């Protein structure tokens, strides 16, 4: 990292609570991010080339915390009793804003959700705010959250106090398109197991209780049920165990299912229907069913309109016009994230920034795209816009108050 961002530390907000030139502060943040761009690119590629699954992100944790510490942040490693979480702090008092980093990868396809870019973007926003935030003007927390891909790292962090002193939270996520209101829905992850009885499939099939039959019947029942599901509901699964040899009736079969819906309350309704399919198949075949949860359910993302509109305005600084609320078009739809749980606790936004690719998230093509110079440039642009949005919240008490009123409204 160059020294430019460190030299500027605290200059932008010298008179924040007075009549600050907010434009000067934003330019200071943008300059700091630009100064660090080459180092952030190295950081992103380092994480990209060392993909680690959820709760195993030891390398990412090390390089991120070292980078932030060298940049002058006060860093707590292995924060919140999670070995690969961290909290990096600059400043103190109120307002206190949090920006999240994610850095876990996917099995077999590496950083196919671009978490290397998310990690670098969180650091970039932190550097920008450090360059503009002077003494007594509030705090910025860069929070390293492990295990977004199914482990619910942010949920554990929330339960252990990560947001107790936070006024608002934000993060960025790569996507094939740009958007400030991505449709990120609630999810639960289930393990389905059927237990039957072995028998010779040719000589004595009548002595068997076929666990695979139960699983196939449940799979077919769920497929038939889709005709009556809401357009926003999603149920998808894979068979992880279906027997060992064709001439042995399987006494065990298993699958993993993801069940999603627009809200946590609608998810509860859908769960009951899906569970009915699993239970009915057990009854029909005489098998025993075990249905268990794979980690914590994620709640839906509730985008704070006040902050999202400020982000859209700040993206305009770079001649990017984002679609308004309800006009997302091709932005991420139907995916899920534990940032949804954050958005249920404090006013939050989770914008997506488009990187040049025809590939969707969670595909090998997106893995490759997440390492390109073009993707890095888009990340830098979005990080500057997010830092400027945070500056608006620091510098305009009425804006943060409006975001909090929206968050507290019962109809949100």
Which residues does each predicted region cover?
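Acidic/His- and Gly-rich active-site-bordering loop/insert found
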Residues: 20-140
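Divalent metal-coordination and catalytic microenvironments
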Residues: 47, 88, 99, 115, ...
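Zn-dependent metallopeptidase/amidohydrolase metal-coordination segment
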Residues: 324-385, 389, 393, 401-412
């Amino acid at each position: 990292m160059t020294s430019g961002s460190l030299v500027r530390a605290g200059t932008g907000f010298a008179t924040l609570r007075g009549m600050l030139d907010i434009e000067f502060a934003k330019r200071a943040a943008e300059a700091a991010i630009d100064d660090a761009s080459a180092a952030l690119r190295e950081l992103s590629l380092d994480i990209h080339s060392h993909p680690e699954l959820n709760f195993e992100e030891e390398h990412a944790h090390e390089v991120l915390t070292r980078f932030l510490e060298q940049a002058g942040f006060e860093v707590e490693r292995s924060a919140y009793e999670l070995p690969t979480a961290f909290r990096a702090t600059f400043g103190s008092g109120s307002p206190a804003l949090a920006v999240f980093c994610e850095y876990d990868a996917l099995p077999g396809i590496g950083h196919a959700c671009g978490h290397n870019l998310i990690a670098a973007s969180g650091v970039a926003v932190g550097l920008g705010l450090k360059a503009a935030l002077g003494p007594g003007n509030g705090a910025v927390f860069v929070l390293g959250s492990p295990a977004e891909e199914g482990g619910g790292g942010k949920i554990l962090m929330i339960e252990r106090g990560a947001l107790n002193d936070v006024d608002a939270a934000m993060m960025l996520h790569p996507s094939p398109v740009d958007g400030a209101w991505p449709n990120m829905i609630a999810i639960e992850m289930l393990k389905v197991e059927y237990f039957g009885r072995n028998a010779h499939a040719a000589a004595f099939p009548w002595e068997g209780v076929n666990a695979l039959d139960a699983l196939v019947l449940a799979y077919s029942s769920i497929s038939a049920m889709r005709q009556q599901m809401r357009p926003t509901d999603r149920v998808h699964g894979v068979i992880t165990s279906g027997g060992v040899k064709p001439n042995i009736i399987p006494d065990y079969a298993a699958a993993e299912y993801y069940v999603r819906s627009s809200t946590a309350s609608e998810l509860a309704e859908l769960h009951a229907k899906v569970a009915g399919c699993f239970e009915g198949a057990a009854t029909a075949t005489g098998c025993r069913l075990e249905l268990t949860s794979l980690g914590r359910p994620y709640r839906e993302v509730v985008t704070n309109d006040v902050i999202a509109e400020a982000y859209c305005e700040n993206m305009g600084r770079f001649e990017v016009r984002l679609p308004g609320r309800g006009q997302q078009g091709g932005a991420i739809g139907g995916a899920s994230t534990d940032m949804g749980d954050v958005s249920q606790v404090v006013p939050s936004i989770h914008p997506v920034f488009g990187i040049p690719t025809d590939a969707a998230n969670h595909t090998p093509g997106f893995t490759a795209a997440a390492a390109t110079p073009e993707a890095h440039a888009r990340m830098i642009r979005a990080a500057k816009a997010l830092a400027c949005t945070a500056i608006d919240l620091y510098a305009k008490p009425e804006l943060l108050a409006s975001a909090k009123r929206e968050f507290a409204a019962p109809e949100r």
